[in-house]
Amino acid sequence: MNCSIQYPVRRNTILLGLSLVLLSGVLQLGVAVATITLVLVTGIESILGLGPAIFLAAGAFAALPAGRLMDRIGRVPVIAGGFGIGAAGCCLIALGCAIDNAVLVIAGFVAFGAMNGSVLLARTAAADMYPEDRRARAISYVLFGALFGAALGPLVFRPLFAGKDLELDTLVIPWLAAAVMALGGLAVALLIRPDPRTIALELHAAESPNRPHAPPAPVSEILRRPGVPSAVIAALASFAVMVGVMNLTGYIVVGHNHEQADVFTVISLHIVGMYALVLVIGALIDRVGRKPSLVTGLVIMAVSTIMLVWAESILWTSVSLLLLGLGWNISYVAATAELVSHASPLERGRLIGTTDLAAGLLGAGLALLGGVAYTEWGVAAVAIGATVAVVAPARAILFARRPAAAPEPV
């Protein structure tokens, strides 16, 4: 690949991975205490799932404009801007906890979610720099960084909770620490150059030297290209179910009479499942194909969610969440690689952004519904509902008829 010689692709890949280290570390705090933060600041226990739903919805709504902006001005400004917004959001949450102000906490959750929605588009930047037969691996290289975030999160946050009662004052310092980590992500993002979009355009021209560049197609047209619908379905189901279950983990663990600090153990192992094998998985997806990988990932997620019906110990809850992360990993990487391969460099941001918008809104809805189901009927209702939500799309993808070929991006 000529671009790998002309441009520092490896360096950019490492920096993108490092940005995911910091994002993952920050997100662990949100996953562990977002629900409890909002309950404490409002005093209303019936709003389980609302905190995660707020930042999931915010991330979803940020994803599409962030994707469009990536196609227009480049990947780096959007990733860096996302970290900046997230740092401001964490500061707002800390201030809201300090003065017991729910409005500030909610505003902070919105900014926190916008950071997640923007920075996760880094996987588009990873795929930009590699040829089609290596795109799943390229995405896996960057996502692997989040594994180290799984270690960074507990190292930073667990000592801040150790031996303390869970009150609003206890949450101020952890949220400020998260803001510092987000600023670190901003600094790392600004070191990425040239912008991966520039590399993608040159690589695309080298792969199709005799084909003129067409203007970006409307998203509605891209979504009709063969292979895209199945990838979108898998992306929506895997992401929505994963975040819907993950964001209730704090209350599920505490509800089984475990300590709040144990939540970080479970979440850390969940993130290990999400990312520990991602390098191997990326290579396997490139080898065995994306459609089988989409279905395999969803089936593993189904096994993990049904386990929650009887898993009460920290050990078995951790195993369930680890498998949930592993199944998501397979479906997510395969879906992203499939989507990127059916879009030109000037279409990828908006396609991934549109998918993330839908997945985030669905995830927010499932987090809210899961909170209601958990409050009214317990963990079993959450587990059974989540299992159905991944089995149905897996079956649809497996038995879908492949449509006639449609024009591919030029």
Label the predicted regions.
Residues 62-74, 277-290, 374:
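Helix-to-loop junctions at the C-terminal end of transmembrane segments
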Residues 138-157, 358-366:
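Glycine-rich segments within core transmembrane alpha-helices of 12-TM secondary carriers
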